[in-house]
Amino acid sequence: VLVALSAGFWWRARTGRAKLVRSGEIVDLGKLKATRAGQPVTSFGKKATLLQFSTEVCSICVQTAKYFKELESKNPDLTHIEVDLTDRMDLAAHFNVMQTPTTLILDRTGKVQARIGGAPKINVIQQELEKLEIK
């Protein structure tokens, strides 16, 4: 019981926190096949992009997307892209997505700067966006 309890506390402490990504990977929008209003997404945000990986059965993903869309509406330099991984195991494997939502924070060139597994904490998102000059 103690082992399970400890594992639960460890998992909860890690969820929603940003991890610095040093891979230098630049996300290929063509491979994501993300759309907005039926049109392909062809550009990143002027300063930052929140790339959210979701699935059909993820209730937290809906809340996360709503929060990110609200942030996007308040800041013209920020773009939110949501990709449903339900039928995209290729992307889940490529980006090593083990839970949804998983959010990648990209700079203006699409380079991955940080990664958040699980429901993102608001203060963590704000801190990461400030690093990319988003207030």
Describe each region flagged by the PLM.
Residues 55-66:
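Conserved redox-active cysteine motifs that mediate thiol-disulfide chemistry
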Residues 68, 72-75:
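Conserved hydrophobic residues forming the short capping helix/wall of the S-adenosyl-L-methionine
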Residues 43-56:
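Short active-site neighborhood of thiol/selenol oxidoreductases, capturing the structured segment around
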